[in-house]
């Protein structure tokens, strides 16, 4: 639980682009501030200093710690204030307990301040981020934006191919991440253009970019072209749209590769990098996400707290004798949960202990996704211990399991 014993005033901030609404409450619930605060360092600092001089320790609570909430938090820290974060979902649920249906900045700020005063367990601590982690946070966010853009563009290409030539989509769609395929579509975007270029010429053009796949890829393309003899109306527009989309997809992939190199350079400069990357399934991007979301792990008392934060701890539901059991939680840090889920999937071929744990869960009747989530939960306990002790990963087989000779 967040410690609020020495707090003299709880200052809830409903952050905004140009101004924040501040609402200050004493531990007894007396209102001492309720006004707009311009999003500028001098004005924010003046308010923090004035409250600190009169009431002592000031706890500044925001509902959005990143983006527009970054400046007030930085100024508050520099002014000697404590800082905390009230998650948006918790804030909205708490707001429903207050009378009235109006939603205003003033009401939101009051809810944030009162929640901090009366329900300290709902608050999340905000560690002082070092320069490397702060830079990683920005780069990781940008990389995730690029990944979403790549997915959107790929889906658009696959949608067009499915509409006009489904057989061709079945060949090219799953391979759009390969640079040889995007290079090919940049130059030959329609079935007619591919057929006109000819099998032999396409093999020669693609071979430098995909030496082992070139012949098989072109053979699959022409087999798909032969399957469809009719021309769907509008197919000619593919010569215009698909090359443009393929070019955009290539550019996004190049940006992500360049960004990965920058993330890797920052990661190598962080002391926890060797610890994180020693765990199977944790690469550059996953390690960066772990640093951004977990830090050094000191803000979590136990591995169970970290698992709960990640949304990997089972939620118990019980009501009399008719409803009982444990279910996967819907909340948690989705960014961290996704990173742990994907790393659990990636590690199974590299770590015999993880594979054995997964197979054991499947043998107990768990689905593929359920088994991966359980593996991710087990790995987050290992991750917590690694961060706590500063030790590298050691593969250990579950008790009672022997490896084949």
UniProtKB/Swiss-Prot annotation:
Keywords: Transposable element. The keyword Nucleotidyltransferase does not apply. One of its GO terms (biological process) is DNA transposition. Pfam families: DEDD_Tnp_IS110, Transposase_20. It comes from the Bacteria. The keyword Translocase does not apply. InterPro entries: Transp_IS110-like_N, Transpos_IS110, Transposase_20. Signal peptide: none annotated. GO terms for molecular function: DNA binding; transposase activity. NCBIfam families: transpos_IS110. This is Insertion element IS110 uncharacterized 43.6 kDa protein. It comes from Streptomyces coelicolor (strain ATCC BAA-471 / A3(2) / M145). The lineage of its organism: Bacteria, Bacillati, Actinomycetota, Actinomycetes, Kitasatosporales.
């Amino acid at each position: 639980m967040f410690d609020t014993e020495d707090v003299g005033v709880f200052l809830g901030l409903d952050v905004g682009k140009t101004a924040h609404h501040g609402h200050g409450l004493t531990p007894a619930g007396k209102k001492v501030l309720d006004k707009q605060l311009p999003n500028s360092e001098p004005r924010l600092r003046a308010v923090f200093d004035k409250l600190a001089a009169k009431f002592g320790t000031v706890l500044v609570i925001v509902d959005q710690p990143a983006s527009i909430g970054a400046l007030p938090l930085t100024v508050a820290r520099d002014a000697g204030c404590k800082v905390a974060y009230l998650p948006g979902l918790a804030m909205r649920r708490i707001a429903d307990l207050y009378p009235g249906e109006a939603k205003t900045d003033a009401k939101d700020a009051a809810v944030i301040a009162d929640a901090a005063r009366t329900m300290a367990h709902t608050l999340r601590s905000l560690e002082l981020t070092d320069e490397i982690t702060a830079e990683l946070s920005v780069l990781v966010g940008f990389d995730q934006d690029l990944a979403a853009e790549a997915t959107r563009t790929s889906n658009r290409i696959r949608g067009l191919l499915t509409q006009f030539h489904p057989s061709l989509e079945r060949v090219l769609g799953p391979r759009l991440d390969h640079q040889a395929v995007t290079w090919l579509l940049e130059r030959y975007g329609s079935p007619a253009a591919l057929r006109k270029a000819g099998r032999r010429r396409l093999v020669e053009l693609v071979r430098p970019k995909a030496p082992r796949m070139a012949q098989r890829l072109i053979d699959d393309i022409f087999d798909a072209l032969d399957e469809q003899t009719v021309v769907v109306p509008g197919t000619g527009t593919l010569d215009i749209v698909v090359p443009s989309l393929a070019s955009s997809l290539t550019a996004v992939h190049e940006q992500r590769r360049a960004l990965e190199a920058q993330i890797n350079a920052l990661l190598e400069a962080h002391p926890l990098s060797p610890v994180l990357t020693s765990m199977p399934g944790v690469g550059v991007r996953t390690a960066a996400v772990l640093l951004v979301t977990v830090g050094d792990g000191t803000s979590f008392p136990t591995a169970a707290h970290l698992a709960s934060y990640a949304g990997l701890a089972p939620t118990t539901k019980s009501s009399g004798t008719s409803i009982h059991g444990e279910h996967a939680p819907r909340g948690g840090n989705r960014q961290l949960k996704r990173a742990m889920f994907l790393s659990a999937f990636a590690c199974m071929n590299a770590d015999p202990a993880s594979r054995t744990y997964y197979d054991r869960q499947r043998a107990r009747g768990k689905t593929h996704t359920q088994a991966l989530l359980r593996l991710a939960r087990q790995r987050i306990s290992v991750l917590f211990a690694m961060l706590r002790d500063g030790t590298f990963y050691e593969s250990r087989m579950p008790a009672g399991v022997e490896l084949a000779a």
